[in-house]
């Protein structure tokens, strides 16, 4: 009994109803079309029909249990009524909203069609138009076709007119348009179905939440209610307690034959004890199975935690067994080999670098010597330039002194020229005086010629005296003329000499001025060249320092470039060799990859097959394990029933030895079907729990009188099961 009461907690509502209906006895249950129990209890003549279980010891418990079951069923009906009322309110609200929505859409659609008709103008009936085939009508979908059938004519007419106004398109475009419209229509239908499914899912989720809440409340109430009646019933079934006076009644009932195929109280107690033992054995087995499953679950949880720990923090062994670790290990070995090779090459390169450093130092020393030689040469050139500069300065000083001397001589010559000029002026004055004297003498001579005309009148002695005077004057004049001639010659010579000297001096002055200008030009040119040489010397010194730095840098860069060139050549040769080896490895790897791809494809197919096989095996294993558990529980129950049947067999053997024919007939009548009275009971109806033979149940199923012969409760094709008494 505890198991039978606890089972509705985890079952559905229909299962609860079935279990509650099973608890009602066959004689007390009534048909759905029959009147209520109170009216059924009264007869026509006012007498009362005795209850078939009136003399049973569990009458009061049965009545209380029936009332409790009826009350629970009424509460269940009440809860269903409340849930259905809430659903009805929600559906009515949604229906009103959707009706308003559809009316608005219908009005909008009519307005749209009317506006399109007014825009398109009057309907031209005579004009032939191509038939319009669109996916907007949703002809292949029942819901859209059902809702849009009333609008299909308007839709077809208006869209046909729109199509007639459109530009003629090629058939490929029309086909693509029709396919696109069809796909869009399918998409809209799928979206509508999806929205409908989502709405249904939301409603079902809400109902599931409400049902789960009701289930939790009912479970609490059931746990609260189990503590009274169930404990009492368990106590009664375990202890076999009976009401006072029950022994005599039971003795009388044992002598009587069972009414309507119902067993006696002792047999019912034994059956209940057997059922209790079966349930206890089943519960024991289920406990063992649960303990086993819990242990397996604990092992699996521990394995899962271990695997999670290993997954979060794998050990070195786990890393060592992975393919990635093996691949990395092989790569690491290759890298170690390469590192060793590179270390050897590094040692060799270090030796070469030391050698190159020594060569570089030697070359640097050589370059330093060369630069020192060049610097010495440049310094010698600089000294020569300085000596030339000193010599030029000395020449300049000499030229300046000569210039000063020439200036002094020129001044002296200027004084001589002034004196010569004065002499020339004096000579000119003398010449002027002599000219005036000559003029005077000429006048005297003219006078004398005039006197010669009167010479005849002059005496001879006067003439002789005059002649003598004249001869003396003439001689004096001759002497004076000769002296004057000599003086004039001297004057002319001196004058010509002075003129020549002056002309020579002038030429010399002109030449000296030219030489002075040349000397000045040379001096300024020498000064300019000196400054230029000084600048050149400075620039040469700066360039020399820079060139020495540049030369050292160039030598260093040349050494580095040579070393880099050697290294690059070595690296190029190494890379060529490595490239060749890598190319060969690449070809081998490509071939191996191709082979591995083939193997991987095969392995993937095998893995997929094994996955499918593992899934099927898992499902079959789960079903087999569940079937095994069910079989184990059935085996335990069958073992208990076997033990009870063995005990009853021993009892019956003992009774058969005592020739107790009345008990045998009673048990035979209990085992026989209450309908045909010829076959044993082997089929139970699930809806009410009454037991009949298989032939009677199948006969009622084939004749469509699918109601229990005892309680008239209806049952279906799958509402019966085979039992073993």
UniProtKB/Swiss-Prot annotation:
Residues 257-267 have a biased composition (Polar residues). Pfam families: BRE1, zf-C3HC4_2. It catalyses: S-ubiquitinyl-[E2 ubiquitin-conjugating enzyme]-L-cysteine + [acceptor protein]-L-lysine = [E2 ubiquitin-conjugating enzyme]-L-cysteine + N(6)-ubiquitinyl-[acceptor protein]-L-lysine. GO terms for biological process: chromatin organization; protein ubiquitination. InterPro entries: E3_ubiquit_lig_Bre1, Znf_RING, Znf_RING/FYVE/PHD, Znf_RING_CS. Residues 18-32 have a biased composition (Basic and acidic residues). One of its GO terms (molecular function) is zinc ion binding. PROSITE patterns: ZF_RING_1 (PS00518), ZF_RING_2 (PS50089). SMART domains: RING. Residues 1-58, 241-268 are annotated as: Disordered. One of its GO terms (cellular component) is nucleus. A zinc finger (RING-type) spans 673-712. It comes from the Eukaryota. Its EC number is 2.3.2.27. It is found in: Nucleus. Pathway: Protein modification; protein ubiquitination. Keywords: Chromatin regulator, Coiled coil, Metal-binding, Nucleus, Transferase, Ubl conjugation pathway, Zinc, Zinc-finger. Residues 175-228, 269-526, 559-656 form a coiled coil. Signal peptide: none annotated. Belongs to the BRE1 family. PANTHER family: E3 UBIQUITIN-PROTEIN LIGASE BRE1, RING FINGER PROTEIN-RELATED. E3 ubiquitin-protein ligase that mediates monoubiquitination of histone H2B to form H2BK123ub1. H2BK123ub1 gives a specific tag for epigenetic transcriptional activation and is also a prerequisite for H3K4me and H3K79me formation. This is E3 ubiquitin-protein ligase bre1. The lineage of its organism: Eukaryota, Fungi, Dikarya, Ascomycota, Pezizomycotina. The gene is bre1.
């Amino acid at each position: 009994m505890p198991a039978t009461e606890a089972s509705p907690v985890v079952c559905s509502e229909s299962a609860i109803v079935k279990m509650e209906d099973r608890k009602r006895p066959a004689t007390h249950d009534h048909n759905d079309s029959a009147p209520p129990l109170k009216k059924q209890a009264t007869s026509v003549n006012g007498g009362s029909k005795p209850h078939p279980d009136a003399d049973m010891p569990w009458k009061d418990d049965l009545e209380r249990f029936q009332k409790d079951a009826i009350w629970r069923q009424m509460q269940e009906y009440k809860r269903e009524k409340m849930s259905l009322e809430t659903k009805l309110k929600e559906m009515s609200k949604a229906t009103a909203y959707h009706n308003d929505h559809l009316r608005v859409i219908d009005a909008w659609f009519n307005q749209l069609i009317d506006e399109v008709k007014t825009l398109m103008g009057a309907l031209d009936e005579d004009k032939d138009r191509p038939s319009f085939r669109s996916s907007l009508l949703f002809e292949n979908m029942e819901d859209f076709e059902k809702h849009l059938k009333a609008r299909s004519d308007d839709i077809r007419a208006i869209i046909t007119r729109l199509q007639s106004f459109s530009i003629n398109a090629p058939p490929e475009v029309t086909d693509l348009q029709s396919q696109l419209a069809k796909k869009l229509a399918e998409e809209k239908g799928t979206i509508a179905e999806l929205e409908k499914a989502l709405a249904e899912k939301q409603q079902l989720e809400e109902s599931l939440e409400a049902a789960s809440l009701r289930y939790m409340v009912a479970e609490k109430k059931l746990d609260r209610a189990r503590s009274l009646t169930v404990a009492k019933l368990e106590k009664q079934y375990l202890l076999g307690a009976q009401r006072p006076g029950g022994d005599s009644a039971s003795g009388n009932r044992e002598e009587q034959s069972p009414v309507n195929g119902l067993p006696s109280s002792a047999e019912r107690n034994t059956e209940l004890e057997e059922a209790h033992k079966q349930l206890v054995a089943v519960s024991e087995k289920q406990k063992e199975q649960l303990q086993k499953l819990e242990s397996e679950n604990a092992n699996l949880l521990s394995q899962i935690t271990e695997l999670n720990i290993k997954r979060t923090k794998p050990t070195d062994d786990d890393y060592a067994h992975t393919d990635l670790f093996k691949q990395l290990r092989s790569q690491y070995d290759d890298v170690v080999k390469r590192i060793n090779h590179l270390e050897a090459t590094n040692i060799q390169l270090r030796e070469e670098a030391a050698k190159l450093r020594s060569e570089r130092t030697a070359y640097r020393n050589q370059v330093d010597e060369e630069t020192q030689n060049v610097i010495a040469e440049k310094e010698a050139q600089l000294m020569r330039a300085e000596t030339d500069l000193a010599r030029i300065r000395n020449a300049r000083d000499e030229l300046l002194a000569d210039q000063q001397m020439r200036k002094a001589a020129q001044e002296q010559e200027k004084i001589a020229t002034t004196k010569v000029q004065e002499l020339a002026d004096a000579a000119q004055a003398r010449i002027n005086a002599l000219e005036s004297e000559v003029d005077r003498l000429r006048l005297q001579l003219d006078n004398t010629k005039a006197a010669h005309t009167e010479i005849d009148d002059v005496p001879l002695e006067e003439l002789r005296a005059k002649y003598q005077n004249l001869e003396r004057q003439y001689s004096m004049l001759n002497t004076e003329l000769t002296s004057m001639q000599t003086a004039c010659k001297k004057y002319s010579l001196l004058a010509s000499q002075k003129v020549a000297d002056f002309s020579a001096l002038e030429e010399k002055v002109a030449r000296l001025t030219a030489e002075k200008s040349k000397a000045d030009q040379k001096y300024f040119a020498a000064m300019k060249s000196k400054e230029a040489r000084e600048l050149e010397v400075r620039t040469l010194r700066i360039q020399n320092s820079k060139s020495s730095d540049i030369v050292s840098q160039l030598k260093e860069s040349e050494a580095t470039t040579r070393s880099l060139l050697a290294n690059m050549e070595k690296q190029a040769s190494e890379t060529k060799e490595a490239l060749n080896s890598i190319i060969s490895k690449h070809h081998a790897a490509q071939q191996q990859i191709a082979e591995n791809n083939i193997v991987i494809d095969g392995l993937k197919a095998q893995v997929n097959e094994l996955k499918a096989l593992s899934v099927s095996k898992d499902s079959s294993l789960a079903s087999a394990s569940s079937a095994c558990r069910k079989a184990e529980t059935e085996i335990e129950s069958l073992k208990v029933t076997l033990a009870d049947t063995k005990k009853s067999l021993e009892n019956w053997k003992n009774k058969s030895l005592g020739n107790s024919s009345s008990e045998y007939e009673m048990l035979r009548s209990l085992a026989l079907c209450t309908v045909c009275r010829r076959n044993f009971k082997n089929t139970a109806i699930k809806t009410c729990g009454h037991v009949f033979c298989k032939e009677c149940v199948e006969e009622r199923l084939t004749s469509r009188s699918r109601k229990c012969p005892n309680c008239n409760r209806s049952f279906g094709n799958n509402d019966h099961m085979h039992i073993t008494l």
